A protein has these predicted regions:
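Rossmann-fold dinucleotide-binding core
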Residues: 1-73
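Helical "substrate-binding/catalytic lid" subdomain
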Residues: 65-158, 164, 168-189
């Protein structure tokens, strides 16, 4: 917001426009773009957003794009390890992976990870083959969650589940993710 004030004082318009979707979605041109800032400037920049991804949406004043991005990441980062652990539990109980994913997709437990299962499988396989990808996911996830926590602290917002998710992600760590991934991917190969 300080940058917006500085830019505005110099007669320069500024939008914040974070994206969501990950590398596979980016390659397909399907990144979601959340744009904060002056609506007139958003309309002026619309052709640039159309060229970059879809969907894109004006979400409010400067800073609103980042807020929605962080809220979205909190949900996705908190849900991903739960989904993988739940699938691992189902596999340990003899359930078929494809059957579980199909039922979850049509049920209240559906998340992006299960809804976009083909893309998720590609990412999961890539992350297991390349440890730096998994390490990057965990590190970036923790960074984003800490940003949400600091935003909440500054605004006086109580967020106990956020703090629980951060602790759980720290405790699970890369090795915990890797273990859950390996179990799920082993089931994929026999699927």
């Amino acid at each position: 917001l300080e940058l917006g004030e500085t830019a505005g004082a110099a007669g320069i318009g500024l939008l914040d426009a974070p994206v969501s979707g990950g590398p596979i979605v980016a390659q397909q041109g399907g990144l979601a773009i959340m744009v904060g800032g002056d609506p007139a400037l958003f309309d002026e920049a619309r052709p640039d957003f159309e060229a970059k991804g879809s969907p894109f949406r004006h979400v409010g004043p400067l800073g609103a794009g980042l807020t929605i991005k962080l809220v979205n990441n909190m949900i996705a980062i908190s849900a991903a390890p739960v989904v993988l652990e739940a699938l691992r539990i189902g596999l340990a109980q003899g359930m078929d992976l494809s059957t579980m994913v199909d039922v979850i997709r049509a049920s209240s437990g559906n998340t992006w990870l299960t809804q976009e299962w083909d893309q998720s499988k590609m990412f999961l396989q890539f992350a297991l083959r390349d440890p730096s990808q998994l390490e990057g996911f965990v590190a970036t996830g923790l960074k984003d969650m800490e940003l949400v926590a600091s935003t909440c602290a500054a605004a006086g917002i109580d967020a106990p589940l956020l703090h629980h998710s951060i602790r759980a992600l720290e405790e699970l760590g890369v090795e915990g993710f890797r273990s859950n991934l390996a179990t799920v991917l082993e089931a994929l190969q026999s699927d």
